[in-house]
């Protein structure tokens, strides 16, 4: 599960162009959130660009790898999932591709992992948010309305068909952000860079 190239200080090139492009849209580089941090591919770069990085990852094994991959002093890791409500959930882990692990929608209210709204977390105002949660992006944004409207960050949202979850992302997450006044700054593959 631990990417040997990352652990040895190698370059993590997966999605690097979107990371670099999106960070350039930020006016400030104080605080970044990595929502769906997984094992830290994005987190590692964000720790180089921002003074504080808050990584949210609900899967314990992934958090362990994240901490090994990104031993940065400016990183805080949170052991919860995000969603539209404060509740409990379970995750479905996909063994062939850890990046496709996702919330089991049938367990909301009864699982073993805490789910919080971003609005309820009390995090400092973010300049940047990366949001890659395998089809759960819309629900996370619903639970982050006050936070997003307050700090007005650049947001990178993954938008694609998620074959493992069966969720077809029909653009609801981006539509909601646009209804709040955000606009599309750039599209790179399945990632949309949103700003104000």
Language model: regions and residue ranges:
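Phosphate/nucleotide-binding beta-alpha loop and adjacent structural elements of enzyme active sites
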Residues: 1-196
């Amino acid at each position: 599960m631990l990417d040997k190239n990352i652990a040895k200080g190698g370059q993590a090139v997966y999605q690097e162009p979107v990371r670099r492009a999106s960070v350039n849209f930020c006016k400030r580089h104080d605080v970044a959130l990595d929502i769906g941090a997984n094992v830290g591919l994005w987190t590692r770069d964000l720790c180089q660009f921002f003074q504080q990085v808050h990584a949210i990852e609900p899967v314990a094994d992934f958090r362990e790898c994240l901490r090994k991959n990104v031993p940065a002093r400016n990183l805080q890791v949170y052991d919860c999932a995000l969603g539209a409500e404060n509740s409990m959930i379970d995750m479905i882990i996909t063994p062939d591709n850890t990046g496709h692990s996702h919330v089991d929608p049938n367990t909301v209210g009864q699982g073993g992992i805490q789910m919080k709204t971003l609005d309820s977390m009390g995090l400092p105002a973010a300049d940047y948010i990366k949001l890659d949660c395998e089809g759960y992006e819309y629900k996370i944004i619903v639970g982050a309305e006050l936070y997003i409207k307050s700090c007005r960050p650049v947001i990178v949202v993954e938008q694609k068909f998620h074959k493992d979850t069966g969720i077809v992302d029909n653009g609801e997450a981006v539509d909601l952000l646009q209804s709040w006044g955000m606009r599309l700054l750039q599209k790179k593959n399945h990632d949309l860079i949103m700003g104000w």
